[in-house]
Amino acid sequence: MGNEFDKILKIIQKDIPLVKEPFSVLAQEVGIEEGKLLKTIEKLVEDGIVRHIAPIYDSRLLGYDSALIAFKVDRQKLEEVANFVNACPGVSHNYERTHDFNLWFTLAVPPEISELEDVVRLMAERERVKDYLVLRVVRLFKIGVKLDYESPAEKESVDTKVYTYTPLTEEEKRIVSITQGSFPLVERPFLEYAKRLRMSEEELLEKLSALKERGVLRRISAVLYHRRAGYVANAMSVWEVPEDAIEEVGRYIAGFKGVSHCYQRTTSEKFRYNLFAMMHGKGQEEIKLLAETISREKALSKYALLFSTREFKKVRIKYFSEEFERWFKELISA
């Protein structure tokens, strides 16, 4: 299959268009029949190369409060604590990384539940974790995984548009709730959603387009199993960057294809790094070389690479469900 296979993998990681027959549009771009494209995508899912295809929503613009959390856990207790963290419906990613703070997870807390810091404190107390970090986003430079490069040092342009939060209507929340699952692999996928929402296909596409215009809907795309797609190494790369240089350095780092996420985050006395980038490569040496290149080019002497050694959890959060509230009630009553 070769080149055709690569084209399909590349195109479904970008942005599935908001039109009645999106797979027909993609099939034309690849140069194959729509039916063949759909069968190939189904096979990629079955073979464990594609993790899922789904709408990707911005948790902040949905009204959720989120942060990157790090726990310092005794090695003999790591799996136990990781399993506890995994049970939280607001945790989408949870990894063991090569650092004294060895358990890193992303947490999103629904509006009107509790303060995020209180949730983290209760989680830490429950598992007797004495040392932890709450690292919030200050500035976003890049977000979006596209594993379609030979070298992580390849460059690309990045959309840096900043969106303002406006509360969602109840109808918009329902649209998010219904569409956030796996994207239907049929000729008219939006019609499947529209039937469940009891609205016309045209009306749904119009409303999804409006959500995309506001940044609430980032895109609809495939997420791959990195290792099975050949990208066996990933690291959270962190730098200590002077405040007056962080905009320039952040944009520079975000321009590398091997960087999927790049943020400025809040710091702590225990963790002074303020610029974070997730790097992916076909081996650790590729990532080390890219981090060294960035550090040398931008004269940054203080940096670290936190390689992922174990993936404990990687899922999509179910927005506007009652799962988090039930879990939180159990947490505070324990």
Swiss-Prot record:
Changing H93Q: Almost loss of activity. Does not alter binding of the substrate analog Fe-URO III. Its EC number is 4.1.1.111. GO terms for molecular function: lyase activity. Keywords: Lyase. The active site is at H93. Transmembrane segments: none annotated. Changing H93 to A/S: Loss of activity. Does not alter binding of the substrate analog Fe-URO III. Changing Y95L: Does not affect didecarboxysiroheme production. Shows a reduced ability to bind the substrate analog Fe-URO III. It catalyses: siroheme + 2 H(+) = 12,18-didecarboxysiroheme + 2 CO2. InterPro entries: AsnC_trans_reg2, HTH-Siroheme_Decarb, NirdL-like_HTH, Tscrpt_reg_AsnC-like, WH-like_DNA-bd_sf. Pathway: Porphyrin-containing compound metabolism. It is an enzyme of class 4 (lyase). H.thermophilus possesses the fused nirDL gene but lacks the genes encoding NirG and NirH. Belongs to the Ahb/Nir family. Involved in heme d1 biosynthesis. Catalyzes the decarboxylation of siroheme into didecarboxysiroheme. Siroheme is probably decarboxylated to monodecarboxysiroheme, which is in turn decarboxylated to didecarboxysiroheme. This is Siroheme decarboxylase. It comes from Hydrogenobacter thermophilus (strain DSM 6534 / IAM 12695 / TK-6). The gene is nirDL.
